[in-house]
Amino acid sequence: MRLYIPYISKKYNLDKNQKIIFWLFVLFWSGITVVRAYRKLYAISPMEEGGLGFSVILAAQITSAYGLISCFIRLPIFILSDIFNRKKIFIQIALFVLTLASLMVVLKPSYNTLYFSSIAMGICASMLAVFNVLFSETFSKEKAAISASILSIAPLLAEFIAAPIQYLSTYGTYKNFKLLWALSASISIVAFVLTFFVRDVSYSAKRFSFEKVKKVFEFKGYLYICLIAILVSFIKFSTSGANMIAYAKVNLNMPPIFLAYIDVLFAFPQLIASVLAGTYFANKIGIEKTLVLGLGSNLVFYIIILLTNSYLPAFLGYVFNGFGYGIAYTCLISMAMQYFEKEDRNVSMGIFQLFFAMGVYFGDRVYLWISKLIPNGLLGFEQNKSIYLIVVGITLVSILMAQFKIKEDI
């Protein structure tokens, strides 16, 4: 990895500002990654094990706050950043909120502080697309897909930073969840300082207007891309992160070392897939077939989960989930940007992220609905496995949409 990053830097001739944005994103995402996957486990773990002892319903409410806030702020962030012609300030605000929320959890862990922490993570996650636009604006229109692929390396580095921290905090019978939130605050403070070295890309062109919105929707395939984004984000967030950690711990009795590194096992193939999607597959087989390839990879993982009750196949099979999401997200985010000029990407990405956030919210919220509507499971599968059966159906619908409609519209 240390050799790969200098290679990318040299190959694409990244300047100082591009490198700073990249490393800022690594730290920014590390502050989230350290705690994001452990929200649900912290909430449902018994108090004698360091948790808060909440019910599954309360835990689902906490995790779904992440997506709920995203639904409200993703589009306004892009509109405001376009109006003020600034993006860095929003990243700084997000880091401040995350630091404050993490410190509150450390000082007084409760439903309210953990809920606020989840909201703060959702605010920060909404900045992912801001980073993508900020980074893509330093590239030409033709290299939008390449910029997305380069930036996709950062989350993997964040996972490598977070994994040993997560293991050291949770390997014992008593889990030191507070330490995770304390380190999240520390990393976020370092990232906040680094933001002052980033240079915003400003335009003299006309800023936000409804003419820009109209221009975006004049591209007839754009809304269809957004609809697929809802499904892809639902698929991802209902079967990974906090939900996967909780499922693996409670249902599969996965050991702490595996739990700590399971997100790395997701992020590494996600990185490979993200790079290959923009630099190889899209050129060889086309963007719609590349998207289908990614969704097919997701499908392999869901079938593995449905067929096994052992943690090892689930752990190893998680590679397919990461690879599939890496391809799917890169394809969708590239399509949401590459058909528009630089000054229009804020609007196109903001609308896209609004749709994407809906899937994030429902991906967490679905666990609350399942616990209430199908307490005994679905079609012979117990309650916690039923989500994977539902996701199989949604993935098949997404594949059909990608295969038969995108090519027709774009």
Predicted regions and their residues:
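A membrane-interface helix-boundary motif in multi-pass transporters
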Residues: 170-185, 369-395
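Structural signature of the two symmetry-related core transmembrane helices
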Residues: 89-103, 289-303
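C-terminal membrane-cytosol helix-exit motif in multi-pass small-molecule transporters
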Residues: 166, 185-204, 398-406
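Helix-to-loop junctions at the C-terminal end of transmembrane segments
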Residues: 73-85, 273-286, 371
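Cytoplasmic helix-loop-helix junction between adjacent transmembrane helices
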Residues: 119-153
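Hydrophobic core of transmembrane alpha-helices in multi-pass small-molecule transporters
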Residues: 26, 112-126, 313-327
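Helix-loop boundary and gating motifs at the non-cytosolic
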Residues: 4-67, 224, 234-252
